[in-house]
A protein has these predicted regions:
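ABC family nucleotide-binding domain
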Residues: 5-220, 224-229
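C-terminal boundary and immediately downstream tail of ABC-type ATPase nucleotide-binding domains
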Residues: 230-258
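Short, Lys/Arg-enriched, disordered terminal segments
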Residues: 1-6, 258
Length: 258
């Protein structure tokens, strides 16, 4: 039986990022993500996880290195790089839905304006996606009428409307009430099962273990451990990762005991 070799989708080579005061944020970051793979970035606050996603998306300048999508450069302001970055989707902690537009109009805006798609086709896809996340009855509602979890589900399918090759998720449940976290994570889990390539930053450890094909652990702007989710959560290679997981275990016990 032949082994299926996955193609590289994203490659990052020796990425360097510093703030304006020259303090380094990302230090010699190199990683790759294969098509259909889900890679989870873990690490303490301030380790550079979210900044890494923002640099991939072109929202932050870099001081060195390469970011390639299917072998093509996506760094910089050139028309070619900007066009390639349209193959990326990103969902943030904040939903960033336009408050004066209905949910349906929020979903239609980018496909029609950026990709020039016909309204009829875009409406059909938007309704199919709303049905997938159980929000068919909300297409004419406005963002203020939705819960946080519902808004985040809309934000996810708004990115899917652009048919991204790679999805970036930056702490998408961080701003949600605990009861709303599951409904959003279920959507992301379903996307992984459908083969969507994803790079995910999260502090939801149980979710990370369930969804990841690989775990990258960051500390001080560097990748200090790469592992399978099974090995990382059972017996991480580095002492720093062990401390990190012990801290989360302590937090969980504290919450359970209250």
């Amino acid at each position: 039986m032949e082994e299926i070799v996955q193609e590289q989708l994203l490659e990052i080579k020796h990425l360097e990022k510093s703030y304006e005061d020259d303090s380094p944020v990302l230090k010699d970051i190199s990683l790759s993500v294969k098509k259909g793979e889900v890679v989870v970035l873990l690490g303490p606050s301030g380790c550079g996880k979210s900044t890494l996603l923002r640099t991939i998306m072109g929202l932050e300048h870099i001081q060195g290195g390469e970011i390639l999508l299917e072998g093509k450069n996506i760094v910089g302001k050139s028309e070619e790089a900007r066009k390639e970055r349209q193959n990326l989707g990103m969902v943030f902690q904040s939903y960033d839905l336009f408050p004066h537009m209905s949910i349906l109009e929020n979903l239609l805006l980018a496909p029609m304006k950026v990709q020039g798609r016909k309204r009829e086709e875009a409406v059909q896809e938007a309704r199919e996606l709303l049905a997938r996340v159980h929000l068919s009855d909300k297409e004419n509602a406005y963002p203020s009428m939705l819960s946080g979890g519902q808004k985040q589900r809309v934000a996810i399918i708004r990115s899917l409307m652009m048919h991204p090759k790679l999805m970036l998720f930056d702490e998408v449940t961080a701003a949600l009430d605990p009861e709303m976290v599951r409904e959003v994570l279920d959507v992301v889990m379903e996307l992984s099962e459908q083969g969507l390539t994803m790079l995910i930053v999260t502090h939801e450890m149980g979710f990370a273990k369930a969804v990841a094909d690989r775990v990258l652990f960051l500390e001080g702007g560097k990748i200090v451990e790469e592992n399978t989710p099974e090995n990382f959560f059972q017996k991480p290679d580095t002492e720093r990762a062990q401390q990190f997981l012990q801290n989360f275990s302590y937090v969980s016990h504290r919450h359970v005991g209250r």
